[in-house]
Design a protein with these regions (language model features):
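Positively charged n-region of N-terminal signal peptides that target proteins for export
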Residues: 1-4, 19
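Sec-dependent signal peptide hydrophobic core
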Residues: 5-12
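C-terminal motif of bacterial Sec signal peptides marking the signal peptidase cleavage site
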Residues: 14-17
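N-terminal leader/targeting pre-sequences
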Residues: 19-68, 73-175
C-alpha cells in the first residue's frame, strides 16, 4: 500500500510540475546584441518578450554620449554597413507619417527617446500590442527587422526620420 501511495505522489508531482512548466513557456523571448556603428563604442542588448498578446521591449545600452538618444526599429535585420545604413529606413508597414509613439500618426518602428546618464548608460522599456514575434501579420511582426540606436534625439516631427542623427548601434531582430 505504501508503494502505491508513494507512486501516486510521485506521478502527481510530475504531472503538476509539467503543467506548471508548460504555462511558464507561453512567453516567447528573443534577446539580440547591439553592435557599434559609425565608429561609436555603443553596445548592449535588447530583449523582446511576447506574452498574452503583448510584446515588452527592453533595451540596455552602454558607451553612449550622455544625453537623449532615439531608438527605432528599421526595415531590415542587416547591420553589415559600417554606418548601419544597411538596416534601411524606419519600419513603417502601415505607411503612416513619422511621429511620437501613441500620439497621432507614427511608424510601428518609432519607439522614441531615452536618456543616457553621465557614464553613457541608458535603457528604455515599451509594452505594446502593435508588435508580435514571428506571427503571420506583417504589419506587426518584428522578426527580420533591424534595431537602431541613434546618435541624436528624435524630434517626432521631421519626415521621415525625426532628424535623429547617425546610427550609433545596430542589431538584427532574428532568431
Amino acid at each position: 500500500m505504501k508503494k502505491l501511495i508513494v507512486s501516486f505522489a510521485i506521478i502527481t508531482t510530475l504531472i503538476i510540475g509539467c503543467k506548471t512548466n508548460t504555462k511558464s513557456n507561453d512567453a516567447k523571448t528573443l534577446t539580440v546584441a547591439l553592435e557599434p556603428k559609425s565608429n561609436s563604442k555603443v553596445g548592449g542588448t535588447a530583449t523582446f518578450t511576447e506574452k498574452n498578446g503583448k510584446v515588452t521591449f527592453t533595451a540596455k545600452m552602454t558607451g553612449l554620449e550622455p544625453g537623449v538618444h532615439a531608438i527605432h526599429i528599421h526595415e531590415k535585420a542587416d547591420c553589415s554597413a559600417a554606418d548601419g545604413s544597411s538596416a534601411g529606413g524606419h519600419w513603417n508597414p502601415t505607411f503612416k507619417k513619422h511621429g511620437k509613439w501613441g500620439v497621432g500618426e507614427y511608424h510601428k518602428g518609432d519607439i522614441g527617446n531615452f536618456t543616457a546618464d553621465a557614464k553613457g548608460n541608458g535603457s528604455i522599456t515599451l509594452t505594446t500590442d502593435e508588435w508580435c514575434i514571428g506571427c503571420d501579420d506583417e504589419t506587426k511582426n518584428i522578426l527580420n527587422k533591424g534595431l537602431i540606436v541613434h546618435q541624436g534625439t528624435d524630434d517626432f516631427t521631421t519626415q521621415p526620420t525625426g532628424n535623429a542623427g547617425g546610427r550609433a548601434a545596430c542589431a538584427g531582430i532574428i532568431k
